[in-house]
């Protein structure tokens, strides 16, 4: 549960904005979507390796 203390005289829109920002930072929605279906650890690891290789090729192309 997220708790956002509201300061005296604070606008409700600003408090909602702080709540939404804190909610996004916690990654709750991202975590729920990831848990909808089981993904094998080997598949997760393979995806991470492919992503790292892609980022490395982008960095290499920028350097040359």
From Swiss-Prot:
GO terms for cellular component: ribonucleoprotein complex; ribosome. This is Small ribosomal subunit protein bS21. It comes from the Bacteria. The keyword Nuclease does not apply. Belongs to the bacterial ribosomal protein bS21 family. It comes from Flavobacterium johnsoniae (strain ATCC 17061 / DSM 2064 / JCM 8514 / BCRC 14874 / CCUG 350202 / NBRC 14942 / NCIMB 11054 / UW101) (Cytophaga johnsonae). GO terms for molecular function: structural constituent of ribosome. Keywords: Ribonucleoprotein, Ribosomal protein. One of its GO terms (biological process) is translation.
